[in-house]
């Protein structure tokens, strides 16, 4: 299981911790990942993701999981999230055609 957000692609960063005496120590900055269950209004089902805490705020800000995925770039989504996005777009197109 990689340490990467499935919806935004936020991943591990590396850098230095710098002390008062300017001594540098290499460190890894890990994203705050949470296992969450989000509900898709279009698909009428629950979907499990491993996302960063900041991503949860972004999902709510955009108006829910469906709106977030439709607006998100395909390159930053995980394969699982990309398949859910395609299902949502297909179902929304079918609903609009009726």
Curated annotation (Swiss-Prot):
One of its GO terms (cellular component) is cytosolic large ribosomal subunit. Keywords: Ribonucleoprotein, Ribosomal protein. The keyword Ribosomal protein applies. It holds the Pfam family Ribosomal_L28. SUPFAM superfamilies: L28p-like. It comes from the Bacteria. GO terms for biological process: translation. GO terms for molecular function: structural constituent of ribosome. The keyword Transmembrane does not apply. Belongs to the bacterial ribosomal protein bL28 family. This is Large ribosomal subunit protein bL28.
């Amino acid at each position: 299981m990689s340490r990467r957000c499935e919806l935004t692609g936020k991943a591990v960063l590396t850098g230095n911790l710098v002390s008062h005496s300017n001594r540098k120590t290499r460190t890894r900055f890990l994203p705050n990942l949470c296992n969450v269950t989000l509900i898709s209004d279009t698909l009428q089902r629950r979907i499990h993701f491993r996302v960063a805490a900041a991503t949860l705020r972004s999902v709510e800000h955009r108006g829910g999981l469906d709106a977030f995925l439709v607006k998100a770039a395909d390159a930053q989504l995980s394969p699982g999230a990309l398949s859910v996005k395609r299902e949502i777009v297909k179902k929304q197109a079918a609903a609009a055609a009726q």
